[in-house]
Amino acid sequence: MKKIKRSAADPDPVYPFGDEVPIPLPPFLVPGGGLTTDGLSLAVQTVDPLNVTLGGVGLKIGDGLSVVDGKLTSEAKIVADPPLQQSGDTLSLSTDSSMMVLPSGQLTINNLPSISVTSSGVGLVSPNAPLQLMSNGALQLSVGGGLTVGAQGSLQISTGVGVNVNAAGVLESYPLPPLVWDYSSKSLTLDIGPGLTVVNGKLQVIGATFSNQMSRMAPAPRADLQSNSIEPLPSPPSKTSLDIAEELQNDKGVSFAFQAREEELGAFTKRTLFAYSGDGLTGPFKAPASAELSSFLTAHPKGRWLIAFPLGTGIVSVDEGILTLEISRSLPEVGSGSSSTSLKVISIYFMDLFFPVPFIDRASHPAPRRSNNSRQLFHSKQRLFLKVKDFKKRSWYSSLFTLINLNIQECPELS
C-alpha cells in the first residue's frame, strides 16, 4: 500500500508543538494597540512606570508618592524660606513698598527722591549742600570753619582759646581777664579793681559824675610823704600795638592759654601776660610756643614773667622756643591788708618804663645800705623795683602805682 505523504504546511494533529501555528484573532482585537500575543496567550503590553502584577496593570511608584483610596498622592512638601513665601500651590516673592514686580514679571525698585535707577544700576541723586557726592560714590559732609570730623568719624567742634568741650561733651567758655566766670550764679562777671564800681548794671568810676555836655571827676585827697607830695599825673592815651592769644598743650595733654598784650602809654610801654589753665596743674608746664609769643616773652629784661591765675602764682620763661611755667605757692596781692608782710620784693614784671626825669625827690630819701629794715627806691630804663619793710604804712606807693596804671604783684625776694 502506498503511504500518503503529509504536507509540511499542515499541522501535525498528534504533536502540534513543533511548529508555530498562527491563531486567528477576532476581528475586534488588533495586535500592537497595547496588546500582544504569545502563542495562544493574549497579554497587555506595558512600558515604565506601568507594569503587570498579579494579572493586573500596576504603577511603579518611588519615594514621596503613594496610593491612597485608589488615588495617587504626593507626600512631598515645599518649604519656602524668606523672601519666598507659599500660598496654597503658589510660590511667590515677598517685597515691601520699596520694590515692585513689573507686568513683565521682572523685579525692580520703586523710584525714590534720593535714588536714581538707570540701566547701569542703582545710584544716589546728587544731594544738596552741605552733603556732597564724591567721585568714588561715597556721600560726604562738607564742614566749614569751627567744625571738624574726628578720628572716629564723628562731627566735632574746633575749640580755641577760652573755649573747651568738657568730658560730658558740653561746650564751655573760659573768659580771659578781666572777665570772670561765676560758677555759683553761672554768669559772666567783670573783675573790677580800686576806683571802679557797678551801679545799676553799669561800670562807673568812683567819685566821677557825667552828663551829656561834660564830665568831671572829683579830686582825690592829696597823699603826703613827710614834706613831699605827689601831684596827680596825667593819664596818657593808650594804643594797643600787639594782642595775641595761643593755646599750648604739653606732651601729657595739659592745656594752657596765654594772652600777650602790648600797649603804648605815652612815654612808656606796657606789656601784659595773662595765663589760663584749662586743666589742673601740679607741676611745671612745658610746651612749644610760636615765634611771636617767644619774641614777646624774651623782651622782658630778666626773661621771667610773674603771673597770677586761679591756681596760684607762677613764673613764665622761654628758652629756644619752649615755654616753661613753674608753679609757686599762692601769694596775696600787695596792699590787701590781710596781715603785715615780711621783707618782700615788689616787682613790676609787666612794664618797660621810660621816665625822662626822676619823679621822686631822691634828696629827701637817700638810698641807705641794704638791710632788713631799709627802704630802697630806684629805677632804671627797663625795670622799677621797690623794697619796703611795711607796705601798709606807705599807702602813697599804692596811690602812685594805681595812678600810672601798673599791675603790682607780691612775690618772694629775687636774687
Curated annotation (Swiss-Prot):
One GO cellular component, as annotated: viral capsid
Coiled coil: none
Record GO biological process: cell adhesion; symbiont entry into host cell; virion attachment to host cell
Chief localisation class: virion
Subcellular location, record wording: Virion; Host nucleus
Keyword field: Capsid protein, Host nucleus, Host-virus interaction, Late protein, Viral attachment to host cell, Virion, Virus entry into host cell
Top-level taxon of the source organism: Viruses
Induction trigger: Expressed in the late phase of the viral replicative cycle.
Membership in a protein family: Belongs to the adenoviridae fiber family.
Subunit structure: Homotrimer. Interacts (via N-terminal tail region) with pentons.
Role description: Forms spikes that protrude from each vertex of the icosahedral capsid. Interacts with host receptor to provide virion initial attachment to target cell. Fiber proteins are shed during virus entry, when virus is still at the cell surface.
Free-text note regarding domains: The tail region anchors the fiber to penton base capsomers, whereas the shaft, built from several repeated motifs, allows the knob to protrude from the virion.
Miscellaneous information on this protein: All late proteins expressed from the major late promoter are produced by alternative splicing and alternative polyadenylation of the same gene giving rise to non-overlapping ORFs. A leader sequence is present in the N-terminus of all these mRNAs and is recognized by the viral shutoff protein to provide expression although conventional translation via ribosome scanning from the cap has been shut off in the host cell.
Record's protein name: Fiber protein
Annotated source species: Snake adenovirus serotype 1 (SnAdV-1)
